[in-house]
Amino acid sequence: MKFYITTPIYYVNSEPHIGSAYTTIVADIIARYKRFMGYDVFFLTGTDEHGQKVLQAAQQAGKDPQEFCDELAEKFKRLWKELKITNDYFIRTTDEMHMKTVQEFVAKMKENGDVYKGIYKGWYCVPCETFWNEDEVIKEGEERFCPECKRPVKWVEEENYFFRLSKYRDSLLKYYEEHPDFVEPDFRRNEMLKILEGGLKDLSITRTTFKWGVPMKDDPEHVIYVWVDALINYISAIGYGWNDEMFNKWWPADLHLIGKEINRFHSIIWPAMLMSVGLPLPKKVFAHGWLTVNGQKISKSLGNAIDPRFFVKRYGNDVVRYYLIRDIMFGKDGDFSEERLVHRLNSDLANDYGNLLHRITAMIKKYFNGRLPSPSAQEGFDSWLKERFFETKDAYHELMDSYRLTEALDKIWEFIADVNKYFNDTKPWILGKEGNMERLGTVLYNSLEAVFKVALMTLPVMPDTSEEVFRRVSFEEKPSKEHLENWGVLKPGSTVIHGEPLFKKIDAKDFKKVVETVSAEQNAITIDDFSKVDLRIAKVLEAEKVPNSRKLLRLIIDLGTEKRQIVAGIAEHYRPEELVGKLIVVVANLKPAKLMGIESQGMLLAAKSGDTLRLLTVDGEITPGAKVS
């Protein structure tokens, strides 16, 4: 049995955050589960390193794009290692093997009559690397915004190669009808069906305005569209075009795991590309929801990107993994909350699970000198516990096989509650006091066997914790499905280690300290970082509204040695006449940018709370151009 699972490859315009870690952790859990069940698994992840957005990020960092990509790819690799991700391969789209595969794949599409040259006229979102038609963008007066990221799009007119995507609309609809489980969850499938039923337009698949990408094989002035380049990673990594035996073993993929915002690329464009070259389609695309912070999508531009390493350092890798899966229903949007994480740690892990093991091993140490007792004649309550285990085990397999990970953990914790009930209701402490060692031994054996089963079922989610449980019960074999299928795996007479509690609870005072420390560490910058920002006092000489914009004002400011123009989104908070004569704080060494076609030569500073915005100013007269330090 084989199982090929992929994550999206992550864009290297910025460092990894908790959102990208979430997808990769989910994939790792599924991969670990499949290995546990006896599958031969290939788990692929990697980085998407071409495109205009990466080029711009490299330029802003003052680095060569390859050097920039090398550094960020290493950061992703290091993070996955810290999170104990068990991927089998890490692909980079700048790999020579991948780039050659992309060229050959697109050449084959062209040979099959599905690629032609034309003129593209339309909107383009650089942050999303996505083309949009006029009827798809968000309109605010003369401004146009990306329907996905809500940032401004730019009008593009250039000679491109196009993919005949429209040709495959009917074939895709038929495939969706014949394979109702192709895209999950159902509501994501319905979104894709709605797009297909509305008709498809041919897709521009090359760019000529920059060179950071894979050149067309027979027309190197054209760089292949970054999304076409990226999607092909799923087959280039497993041998397409260079290792037929490997490719035939693993393709088609069993599961493409993605975020909902890139569903259209994976569930419409990618299948059409595969149809074009005659390859089978992946078995399933699962589009999960967004991980949000305070209700907002995680984004570097919003300043709410969370570095998962801080939480792993504070709470442990297994705690973070457990929280993300248990608290966020897989497939739907979920909000990351450190307070909820601590609640799950204290309640689910420390109280329900860890304390149960601690109580059992303490009694084995006290009454049986740390040796696992032999079970004897079974009573009704013993049979009930076993029945509950087998019911849980069967439900666990069904839920894990259908990627209902949150529900699988719910079932396990229902069983933990059952084990706690069994332990409490059989009252082993009374059995010990009464000297009923035979019955006590049976209760403690069954209780520890049940906790061992919990460790087996949670092994994909909390590998370190499960390994620690195995160590404490002297289980030295490689864990497998067979150990979960049968009751009575633990060997009587084996050493049972009592040890420290599996999880350390966090009280309210400690939680406050952790939050303050983590916040300080995540936001900390060096004095060298701060010194790079040139903050100056400027005097506003003129102010006016930008035509056709309800948000923007154009300011002429005096910086002492020169006058500059700044465009700022403060029109909803200040009238132009209110600003003239004010002394404000500006970033003077910011790279100029165009807003609504007007060049902004700096950025003013303001504070915002809810709907209130106020400019940063000074409490008295000072010469324009004075440096803020």
Swiss-Prot record:
A motif ('HIGH' region) lies at residues 10-20. It catalyses: tRNA(Met) + L-methionine + ATP = L-methionyl-tRNA(Met) + AMP + diphosphate. Its EC number is 6.1.1.10. It comes from the Bacteria. One of its GO terms (biological process) is methionyl-tRNA aminoacylation. Keywords: Aminoacyl-tRNA synthetase, ATP-binding, Cytoplasm, Ligase, Metal-binding, Nucleotide-binding, Protein biosynthesis, RNA-binding, tRNA-binding, Zinc. CDD domains: Anticodon_Ia_Met (cd07957), MetRS_core (cd00814), tRNA_bind_EcMetRS_like (cd02800). Residues 529-629 form the tRNA-binding domain. The keyword GTP-binding does not apply. One of its GO terms (molecular function) is tRNA binding. Zn(2+) binds at residues 125, 128, 146, 149. A motif ('KMSKS' region) lies at residues 297-301. Binds 1 zinc ion per subunit. It holds the Pfam family Anticodon_1. Transmembrane segments: none annotated. ATP binds at residue 300. Is required not only for elongation of protein synthesis but also for the initiation of all mRNA translation through initiator tRNA(fMet) aminoacylation. Homodimer. Belongs to the class-I aminoacyl-tRNA synthetase family. MetG type 2A subfamily. This is Methionine--tRNA ligase.
